């Protein structure tokens, strides 16, 4: 499975690791993804999502029902 947040769409990005001597090597910055279960009251069931920390904050702000409606409109869930 891809390392992509199901709510925000955050994915790994590429950058440079910079040492003290200013040597640069390529590296990947991974999003902070967690599997979380959310209780959806309207469907009377749990929904398991792979979300980033920013996605969790978005769910706290807007509510799981609003986020779920947006995901269904995009065709992701």
Swiss-Prot record:
Gene Ontology terms: biological process: translation
GO cellular component: cytosolic large ribosomal subunit
InterPro entries referenced in this protein's UniProt entry, alphabetically: Ribosomal_bL28, Ribosomal_bL28/bL31-like_sf, Ribosomal_bL28_bact-type, Ribosomal_bL28_sf
Cited Pfam families: Ribosomal_L28
Key words, A-Z: Ribonucleoprotein, Ribosomal protein
GO MF, one annotated term: structural constituent of ribosome
Homology family: Belongs to the bacterial ribosomal protein bL28 family.
HAMAP family on file: Ribosomal_bL28
Record's protein name: Large ribosomal subunit protein bL28
Species per Swiss-Prot/TrEMBL record: Dechloromonas aromatica (strain RCB)
Name of the gene: rpmB
